[in-house]
Swiss-Prot record:
Disulfide bonds: none
Protein function: Core subunit of the mitochondrial membrane respiratory chain NADH dehydrogenase (Complex I) that is believed to belong to the minimal assembly required for catalysis. Complex I functions in the transfer of electrons from NADH to the respiratory chain. The immediate electron acceptor for the enzyme is believed to be ubiquinone.
GO cellular component: mitochondrial inner membrane
Membrane topology: Multi-pass membrane protein
Protein name in the entry: NADH-ubiquinone oxidoreductase chain 2
GO BP, one annotated term: mitochondrial electron transport, NADH to ubiquinone
Main location: mitochondrion
Spans through the membrane: 1-21, 25-45, 60-80, 95-115, 124-144, 149-169, 178-195, 200-219, 242-262, 274-294, 326-346
Catalysed reaction equations from the record: a ubiquinone + NADH + 5 H(+)(in) = a ubiquinol + NAD(+) + 4 H(+)(out)
The entry's keywords: Electron transport, Membrane, Mitochondrion, Mitochondrion inner membrane, NAD, Respiratory chain, Translocase, Transmembrane, Transmembrane helix, Transport, Ubiquinone
Family: Belongs to the complex I subunit 2 family.
Length: 346
């Protein structure tokens, strides 16, 4: 791909995201979603590998179907109520259609099948965009219409996402697939609290985006596409691998790391809303994903692969870790003491 095309595509992604999150009219929001879809497809398929082309095709087909559903739900609402305002989504059928459309765009269960396959066929930095930036516009639409959505439906989808995201990630050896199922599991936490506390859902997404970005950037630095490549990277980049372990434990939600904050606040809010069984269920289901985070963390720091031949060990990394990776990793590990202030600001 032409090197000058990448900045144009990234700017288009920023433009599409900005249009969607700042719009009040359904057609403008839909336009932003379409700009995003068209801008990310060349980034997915830029390696010209058959798997990358397949991933781009799958992504295009699912996103096109979801965008058509968004447009159809807004037209149904406009037909019934005469309103094109995003916050005035009052028709029950429109709410159901929009929930399905956004679930497809986000990769929530039961519309999750495309997401791990697309991430597996994408380069690591494109997978980072798909897991974070590309989820922000659809999530914004859900937040703007949260008062009209069905809480029971969202809770069911959230619990199913947390269960399936943890369950399907257990036997994976590819790092991108592990992070795809991690994303599905975290979306479950966001969806379960969305109706009751939209601001807390947004805070959870922000923290998830910070932690996932740190993991993807670390994996990109050590060029680790599967667990065996993570194993061999310890002698080359020991500091980065140790940091990766801490960020993965934070992503798992272990105290005293940043990732514990959203889980703690969500369980607290669900208990206030008298949804203790749902809080207990999603807390127990997070133990499934904890297992594969621990396995990835164990591979990144503790074990070295057996090797019978003599070879020179590389004890020092040739390049220092980049500043963005260091900043994101620090935020992923150290923000828990600031949680009262962060919760008050958000």
């Amino acid at each position: 791909m032409n090197p000058h095309a990448t900045p144009v595509l990234v700017l288009s992604l920023a433009l599409g995201t900005t249009i969607t999150i700042s719009s009040n009219h359904w057609v403008l929001a839909w336009t932003g979603l379409e700009i995003n879809t068209l801008a990310i497809i060349p980034l997915i398929s830029k390696s010209h590998h058959p798997r990358a082309v397949e991933a781009a095709t799958k992504y295009f087909l699912t996103q096109a179907a979801a965008s058509a559903l968004v447009l159809f739900s807004s037209m149904t609402n406009a037909w019934a109520t005469g309103q094109w305002d995003i916050t005035q989504l009052n028709h029950p059928t429109s709410c159901l259609l929009l929930t399905a459309a956004i679930a497809i765009k986000l990769g929530l269960v039961p519309f999750h099948f495309w997401f791990p396959e697309v991430l597996q066929g994408s380069p690591l930095m494109t997978a980072l965009l798909l897991s974070t930036l590309m989820k922000f516009p659809p999530l914004t639409l859900l937040l703007m219409t949260s008062k009209s959505l069905n809480p029971a439906l969202l809770t069911t989808m959230a619990l199913a996402s947390a269960a399936l995201g943890g369950w399907m990630g257990l036997n994976q050896t590819q790092t991108r697939k592990i992070l795809a199922f991690s994303s599905i599991s975290h979306l479950g936490w966001i969806a379960i609290i969305l109706v009751y506390s939209p601001k807390l859902a947004l805070l959870t997404f922000y923290l998830y985006a910070i932690m996932t970005s740190a993991v993807f950037m670390a994996l990109n630095k050590i060029k680790a596409l599967n667990l065996s490549m993570v194993l061999t990277s310890w002698t080359k980049t020991p500091v980065l691998n140790a940091t990766l372990m801490l960020v993965l434990l934070s992503l798992a939600g272990l105290p005293p790391l940043t990732g514990f904050m959203p889980k703690w606040l969500i369980i607290q809010e669900l208990t206030k809303q008298e949804m203790t069984p749902a809080a207990m269920a999603i807390a127990m289901l997070s133990l499934l994903s904890l297992f594969f985070y621990l396995r990835l963390a164990y591979h990144s720091t503790i074990t070295l692969p057996p090797n019978s031949s003599n070879h020179m060990k590389q004890w020092y990394t040739s390049k220092p870790p980049s500043t963005p990776t260091a900043i994101l990793a620090s935020l992923s590990i150290l923000l828990l003491p600031l949680s009262p202030m962060i919760h008050a600001i958000v």
